[in-house]
From Swiss-Prot:
Organism: Sulfurihydrogenibium sp. (strain YO3AOP1)
Underlying gene: rplS
UniProt keyword terms in alphabetical order: Ribonucleoprotein, Ribosomal protein
Entry's Gene Ontology cellular component terms: cytosolic large ribosomal subunit
SUPFAM superfamilies: Translation proteins SH3-like domain
Superkingdom of source: Bacteria
PROSITE patterns: RIBOSOMAL_L19
GO molecular function, one term: structural constituent of ribosome
Protein name per UniProt: Large ribosomal subunit protein bL19
InterPro entries in UniProt: Ribosomal_bL19 (IPR001857), Ribosomal_bL19_CS (IPR018257), Ribosomal_bL19_sf (IPR038657), Translation_prot_SH3-like_sf (IPR008991)
Function: This protein is located at the 30S-50S ribosomal subunit interface and may play a role in the structure and function of the aminoacyl-tRNA binding site.
Biological process according to GO: translation
PANTHER family: LARGE RIBOSOMAL SUBUNIT PROTEIN BL19M, RIBOSOMAL PROTEIN L19
Keyword Ribonucleoprotein: yes
Length: 133
């Protein structure tokens, strides 16, 4: 039964979503409807949480705008998300970065992954995908 649910969910998942993890900085292009007009709004921030799987997968993005921290939770299969770009790959050792909320300025920065670390990370994810299915 579980395998059947997974196969059905695959139809509803967007195929053009890049792989990103907690600690990465992402730029989301959101479709916003204001009255009769429709426009694209860009929301760029740090991924502090990823939870769930399949169509129920959500991720939380945090950005600081004019000194005010702002967090938004997005479902991975959200129809208002036009495009997701990974701006930077972050080097973190936690699955949830809630501690970032209490930090200010330079202390809230996440170290960026080196080029060879990104390639290693991609190779590991490819190997795990091949092993799982």
């Amino acid at each position: 039964m579980h395998q059947l649910i997974r196969e059905i969910e695959q139809k509803y998942l967007p195929q053009d979503i890049p792989e990103f993890k907690v600690g990465d900085t992402v730029r989301l292009h959101l479709k916003v409807k204001e009255g009769e007009k429709e426009r694209t709004q860009i929301f760029e921030g740090l991924v502090i949480r990823v939870r769930g799987s399949g169509t129920g997968k959500t991720f939380t993005v945090r950005k600081v705008s004019y000194g005010v921290g702002m967090e938004r939770i997005f479902p991975i299969a959200c129809p208002s998300i036009q495009k997701i770009e990974v701006v930077k790959r972050g080097k973190v050792r936690r699955a949830k970065l809630y501690y970032i909320r209490n930090l200010k300025g330079k202390a809230a920065k996440i170290k960026e992954l080196k080029e060879w670390e990104i390639k290693k990370r991609q190779a590991e994810s490819q190997a795990s995908k091949e092993n799982n299915g």
